[in-house]
Swiss-Prot record:
SUPFAM superfamilies, sorted: P-loop containing nucleoside triphosphate hydrolases, Transducin (alpha subunit), insertion domain
Pfam families (UniProt xref): G-alpha (PF00503)
CDD domains the record matches: G-alpha (cd00066)
Annotated GO biological process: adenylate cyclase-modulating G protein-coupled receptor signaling pathway
Binding positions (Mg(2+)): T97, S229
GO cellular component: endomembrane system; heterotrimeric G-protein complex; perinuclear region of cytoplasm
Aminoacyl-tRNA synthetase as UniProt keyword: no
Stretch list, region G1 motif: 85-98
Primary localization: cytoplasm
SMART domains in the record: G_alpha
Binding positions (GTP): E93, S94, G95, K96, T97, T98, D198, L223, S229, G251, N317, K318, D320, A377
Similarity comment: family membership: Belongs to the G-alpha family.
Annotated protein name in UniProt: Guanine nucleotide-binding protein subunit alpha-1
Length: 402
């Protein structure tokens, strides 16, 4: 018996069910976490700047040499050697004698006791002479002193010799009483019409001192004493070897003839003129103004052939009194009616007067300079400054190649 084999079954054409399509799962993204707020950045401190190098020490200054003192003008006692001569001249009352006295006080040893005693006699005579001039003015203007006692005193004063009188208590009391009189005060207000010196109130204020038996005049007294220059006086100066000799000559008409005695010893001129007395008459001639006399002398001097190439130093003196007179009076325009500037401006009036002098000296040239100074001769510093400047000019111009 055989065994029978099984027949394999044929594959079935039946379709298998499709595998289920897996569902697409959408991935929902997880929300991103919100960024945490970052702390604001703190400002970082600036790195420290490197220290600047210390500046190099400044070089030590070189030691400075002490400034050399300006060359000094000195007076010379022994004036016998040759020197550059200057003629110090001008009309009367121009102040050149005061200028010379200042030179003596500042550069030399001043005045000895004998000189001062002589000045005291002069000052006392000035007091008497002044009162006489005021009394004469009253008489000329028909003004009488009303007080009978004072009128009698006035006659006594008229009879006194100013240069040779005993300055006793009786005379002093009469002078004091008259000085306080209203008529005399009125006369003094018109002193510019007379030859009365400007300084007399200074002396009347100290008349009791001046009457003292042992009184010795001060330098201020000496500078104000009025003495008409007689003769010729010389003072010699030295500036670094440059010798300059100043010859002071009298300014009154009677003294001018003596100027010829020193002409062969001088090369230049210092000419003094009082600007303050432009409206005052000459002492010698009441009909001639002092300023016109000065202009005439200046013209004559500057046109001498000897001075055709010489320096001329024009010293315009008493500028303080001139300034007050110009500011407070109409005197300038009365004397110079042709003046078209401001007659109350001292500088404008002074410039006008200076031009009048320059016109007298025309023609001008570089070889003959005319150098002007406005000064107050009573001021010693101004006189010294002027004298120094004159000496320096002479030294530079005439001794520089010596």
């Amino acid at each position: 018996m055989g065994c029978s084999a099984s027949k394999p079954s044929e594959p079935s054409n039946a379709k298998l069910p499709s595998a289920p399509v897996p569902k697409k799962v959408e991935q929902v993204p997880e929300p991103k976490p919100e960024p945490q707020p970052q702390p604001e950045p703190q400002p970082q401190p600036e790195p420290p700047k490197p220290a600047e190098p210390a500046p190099a020490p400044a070089p030590a200054p070189e030691p400075q040499k002490p400034a050399e003192p300006a060359p000094k003008v000195v007076a010379v006692e022994d004036d016998t050697n040759e020197a550059y001569g200057l003629l110090l001249c001008g009309a009367g009352e121009s102040g050149k004698t005061t200028f010379t006295r200042q030179l003596k006080l500042r550069y030399l040893n001043g005045f000895n006791e004998k000189d001062c005693r002589d000045f005291l006699r002069t000052i006392r005579g000035n007091l008497v002479e002044t009162m006489q001039l005021l009394l004469v003015w009253l008489e000329h203007n028909n003004i009488e002193i009303e007080d009978s006692e004072l009128s009698s005193m006035a006659q006594d004063i008229i009879d006194v010799d100013p240069q040779d009188c005993e300055f006793n208590e009786e005379l002093v009391e009469k002078l004091k009483a008259l000085w306080e009189n209203e008529q005399i005060k009125k006369a003094f207000e018109h002193k510019d019409e007379t030859a009365v010196p400007d300084h007399m109130p200074y002396f009347f204020a100290k008349i009791d001192e001046l009457a003292g038996e042992d009184y010795i005049p001060s330098n201020e007294d000496v500078l104000r004493a009025r003495i008409r220059s007689i003769g010729i006086e010389a003072i010699t100066f030295d500036l670094q070897g440059a010798r300059i000799r100043i010859f002071d000559v009298g300014g009154q008409k009677s003294e001018r003839s003596k100027w010829a005695n020193v002409m062969n010893q001088v090369e230049g001129v210092i000419f003094c003129v009082s600007f303050a007395e432009f409206d005052k008459p000459m002492f010698e001639d009441q009909n001639v103004l002092r300023i016109n006399d000065s202009l005439e002398i200046f013209g004559n001097i500057t046109h001498q052939e000897k001075f055709s190439n010489s320096p001329i130093f024009l010293v315009c003196n008493k500028f303080d009194v001139f300034t007050e007179k110009i500011k407070n009076t109409d005197a300038f325009v009365k004397i110079f009616p042709e003046f078209s500037g401001d007659s109350h401006n001292p500088e404008a009036c002074a410039d006008y007067l200076i031009q009048r002098f320059l016109d007298k000296a025309a023609p001008l040239s570089e070889d003959r300079p005319i150098i002007q100074y406005k000064i107050v001769a009573l001021n010693g510093d101004q006189v010294v400054e002027t004298a120094d400047a004159i000496c320096k000019f002479i030294s530079d111009k005439y001794y520089q190649d010596a």
